[in-house]
Amino acid sequence: MLLNRFVQVCLLALACSSCAGLRSSSGVYEIVREPLKAGPRRIHLIYARPLRPTHPDYLVVFATGDGGWRSVSSDVFEHLAAEGYQVAGIDSSRALRPVLRAGERMSTTQATARVMAALADAKGDLGLPESTPVIVVGFSRGATLVAFAALHPELRQAIGGAIALGLTREVDYLRTPRPERVPEIQVDSRGRVQIYPALKLLGSTPLAVIQSTHDPYVPAAESRELLGPDTPTLRLYEVDARNHRFGGARDRMIADVDDALRWILASRGE
């Protein structure tokens, strides 16, 4: 009996570690964890179910940075939930750990299959129609999901808008076979897909990039050079912050996320 109890406690602790720091908010939203089978490892999707959804016709998918459910990632996820969005979250560090440890890269075809499966699971678990448009939001490595969504036609059709926070320069977990490379898909000397050129493939899909002025990877000024001027489908928000995690300006970053979401919804006639 004692052994069984010990095993149950260990399993509960392991399960909770996948969404550490995220808590339901009484009367506002409920945090729910559901397993997603992806390759040889079991990972989880974390759902925020608002008690009174403000945008029931949309699904927001949030991908964390390497730190998992901490810092910017937990702040943004919980804010979206409090605002009434139906959110499905994934811990990028856990999802990509086997790939990064193996020192290999997934093909865009393999990655697309996994992402499409995750989107289907999320819509099913939340009771949403298959046709529900998805708004992708990600921080740091999780923001590369935005670029990945641009790479594959099937994913592009499923995305209704995208917000990238702390966007880095390259994707280090994907490979694009030469036959799949259109001119917008560029790789560096190490074969890593370059994010900013790939964003052009999003076409008419509204994209917002939120970047810190002192981001050590790609500061906001350089992001502006890479993106060019704002357009009807592209916006760059430059946040005067200390570092990659928007230190000293977290509230400003959250306000920009809200503005970007309003802009995306307005561009879709909402």
Give the residues covered by each predicted segment.
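N-terminal cap/lid segment of alpha/beta-hydrolase-fold proteins
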Residues: 22-55
